Amino acid sequence: MIDLDLRAYFDTVRHHLLLEKVARRINDDEVMRLLKLMLTTSGKQGVPQGGVISPLLSNLYLTEVDRMLERAKETTRNGKYTYVEYARFADDLVVLIDAHPRNAWLLGAVNKRLREEFAKLQVEINEEKSRIVDLDRAESFGFLGFDFRRLRSMERQVWRAHYTPKMKKRTALLRKLKDVFRRYQSQPVDRVVQLINPVLRGWVNYFAVGHSSECFSFIKDWVEKKIRRHMGRARNRRGFGWKRWSRRWLYEELQLFKGYRVRRASAPKALPA
């Protein structure tokens, strides 16, 4: 599997190349004029991050890469089986190559063509963070905030994709929540709950697929302890107040976020090598 990292992608998008791509699809001078004005706010190159249209433009800029990968996929197809698969959103790209020895040439060929396409678009590959991943050796790769790996199910002994939130994403969430508890340590607990609930809801809703249950349990327990410690300090009490404040009280009376349910996605089976 090819896991590519693009160096400062959003800051290096070439405006003239992007506008050429947009012009092939939109025949409206006013729209093109407004788009040029929007792009120039970020300087001579790059796409302004945070804008409503920025994800669309970032995806559009790399459509030639998608076309190349689609051609590779169809050229090497054998009936219903494909030996090249890929997934991309903006600058996050992973390419999976069939691991059978007879397809070993594909890895080098696709890797070479990818680099050629990125060079045409003047997009630089971050060699330090790009790598070839061997899923047969239980190695993992990251995509859109998740860690993916290939595991065999214990019940049916079938290979399946296993994906969980990346550790750095969990760490970033806890750091953000810690900051709320620190800055509002003298405030009533219901105020703290009002502030952390939207943060938890947004994060959990995004990661509520795959195999996030263990991660969610850790976060849920961590938040409960922080809430208990907050209330204990307000009353000059030590400990976490397990007897004073039941779990039911935290969720029913305080209305602490409790929607940690994981949606089971129907992930495709991973074919054996």
Question: Where are the language model's segments positioned?
Answer:
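Conserved polymerase palm-domain catalytic core
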Residues: M1-L135, S140
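Alpha-helix N-cap/helix-start motif at coil-to-helix transitions, marked by capping-box chemistry
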Residues: D29, R33, L60-T63, T164-T171, ...
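A glycine-rich phosphate-binding loop feature that marks nucleotide/adenosyl-phosphate handling sites
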Residues: Y86-F89, E128-A138, I196-V199, F216-E224, ...
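Amphipathic alpha-helical core segments of compact helical bundles
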Residues: T40, S58, L62-D66, N197, ...
